[in-house]
C-alpha cells in the first residue's frame, strides 16, 4: 500500500526518476501550504480500498477501509508527523508504547510477564481486562480532536493546518466492481495515513486521562510502584488485584 498511487495516479517511480527536480517542487509546495494553511483540494481526496478481515466477506463490518493518498501528500504528512512526535513524546505516558522510539509490542508483553512473575512471587492476585476499541479510527470526532490538540499544547498553526486538511475532505471507494461517486467525510482519521496513529493516540490519551486512572489506587502494587494499565495504540490492558477494585475505579 505504501507504493500504491492515490487519486492523482502518479506512481512513486516518477518521483524517483525526477529526483532533485521533484524535491524542489515539493519543497516549494510544502512551504506554501504551511504559510497559507491551506491544502490543494486534490490532496484532500482519498481512494479507499476495502481490505477483507476474518469473517463473513458479505458483511461490511468485516472489511478495513485503507486510504490511498497521493505520494506528494505523503511527503507533507511525513513532515507534519515529525512535528507531532515532539508533542507525543511529552504528552504520552510511559504505559503507551505505540510510536515511541525503541519500543513496541514486545516491551508491553515483557512488562506483563514481569508483573505476573512478581505477583506470583509476592503471592498477589492479579486480574487483567483486555480492551480493544471498536472502529477506533472511524469514531474520532473532528471537533473534539482539535480541542484536545489545543489542550495538549500543540501549536495553533499546526492544529489549524490539520483542521483544514480534514475540512471538506472527499473520498471514493474502489473495488473490483468499480469506483463509487465522491462523497464527503465528516468524522474519523484515515486508515493508511501516517498521521492517523499520532492523532488517535493523542485522542485516546485524553480519554484515558478523563477516566481518572492516574488518581485511583486500583492496580498492581509491586516494589513500591502502582501500575493499572498498559497500552499499545488502541489495545489497552487494565489490571487490578481484585474484581471489586477494578469496578470501583
Question: Across the structure, where does each feature detected by a protein language model lie?
Answer:
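Conserved pre-catalytic core of RNA-dependent polymerases
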Residues: 1-203
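Catalytic palm subdomain of template-directed nucleic-acid polymerases
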Residues: 135-152, 229-249
Amino acid at each position: 500500500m505504501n507504493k500504491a498511487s492515490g487519486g492523482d495516479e502518479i506512481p512513486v517511480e516518477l518521483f524517483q526518476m525526477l529526483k532533485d527536480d521533484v524535491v524542489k517542487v515539493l519543497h516549494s509546495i510544502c512551504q506554501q501550504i504551511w504559510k497559507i494553511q491551506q491544502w490543494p483540494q486534490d490532496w484532500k481526496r482519498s481512494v479507499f480500498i476495502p481490505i477483507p478481515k476474518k469473517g463473513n466477506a458479505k458483511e461490511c463490518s468485516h472489511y478495513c477501509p485503507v486510504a490511498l493518498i497521493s505520494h506528494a501528500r505523503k511527503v507533507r504528512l511525513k513532515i507534519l508527523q515529525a512535528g507531532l512526535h515532539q508533542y507525543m513524546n511529552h504528552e504520552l505516558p510511559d504505559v503507551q508504547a505505540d510510536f515511541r522510539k525503541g519500543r513496541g509490542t514486545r516491551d508491553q508483553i515483557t512488562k506483563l510477564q514481569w508483573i505476573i512473575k512478581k505477583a506470583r512471587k509476592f503471592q498477589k492476585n492479579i486480574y487483567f481486562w483486555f480492551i480493544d476499541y471498536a472502529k477506533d479510527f472511524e469514531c474520532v470526532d473532528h471537533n473534539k480532536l482539535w480541542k484536545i490538540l489545543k489542550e495538549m499544547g500543540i501549536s495553533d498553526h499546526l492544529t489549524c493546518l490539520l483542521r483544514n486538511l480534514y475540512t471538506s475532505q472527499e473520498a471514493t471507494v474502489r473495488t473490483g466492481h468499480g469506483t463509487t461517486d465522491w462523497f464527503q467525510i465528516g468524522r474519523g482519521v484515515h486508515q493508511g495515513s501516517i498521521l492517523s496513529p499520532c492523532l488517535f493516540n493523542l485522542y485516546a490519551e485524553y480519554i484515558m486521562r478523563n477516566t481518572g486512572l492516574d488518581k485511583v489506587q486500583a492496580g498492581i502494587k509491586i516494589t513500591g510502584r502502582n501500575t493499572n494499565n498498559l497500552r499499545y495504540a488502541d489495545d489497552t490492558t487494565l489490571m487490578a488485584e481484585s474484581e471489586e477494585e477494578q469496578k470501583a475505579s
